[in-house]
Curated annotation (Swiss-Prot):
Biological role stated in the UniProt entry: Catalyzes the deamination of dCTP to dUTP.
Matching Pfam families: DCD
Region (Disordered): 169-193
Protein name in UniProt: dCTP deaminase
Binding site for dCTP: R110, S111, S112, L113, A114, R115, D128, V136, L137, E138, Y171, K178, Q182
Matching SUPFAM superfamilies: dUTPase-like
Underlying gene: dcd
Amino acid sequence: MRLCDRDIEAWLDSGKLGIEPRPPVERINGATVDVRLGNQFRVFRGHTAAFIDLSGPKDEVSAALERVMSDEINLPEGEAFFLHPGELALAVTLESVTIPDDLVGWLDGRSSLARLGLMVHVTAHRIDPGWQGRIVLEFYNSGKLPLALRPGMLIGALSFEPLSGPAARPYNSRQDAKYRGQQGAVASRIDKD
């Protein structure tokens, strides 16, 4: 059962759930909290690798990732990031989220943006118990026109679901947590699997 708006506010008030900066009550709706787009992005460099062998030797996977991913792009205030049709890019939420060990979060895109072809997450929409950091967004433009994305715009909504008990291995306490405490548009770390 997902938390309703009153419960989300109570969890925020108690400090069990953290969202910084804290959203105003107008962005806590029914069963979700609206999140905004941050100013950090990463894109794929075109045609710098023939392919990435996802199950190949770790050093080869790492080298291929280095070739295809850009450095982090930090947009100055007021500028737009343009996502062209058929392009995949990484971005990050403006908000940093701290989820307790007995809660799981879910990220959903906004219907208004989806109707224009924008996918906010390709597949990874679960936010694990024990998570702490900003949420990386996997943008894909499946529409026909370039989309101008501006930092600060509403980009998605988080919902939260209590677990049957505290997780025995919450994300941030695991030694193998590849994205622990991320604050930027962190590229894939599949080579760390």
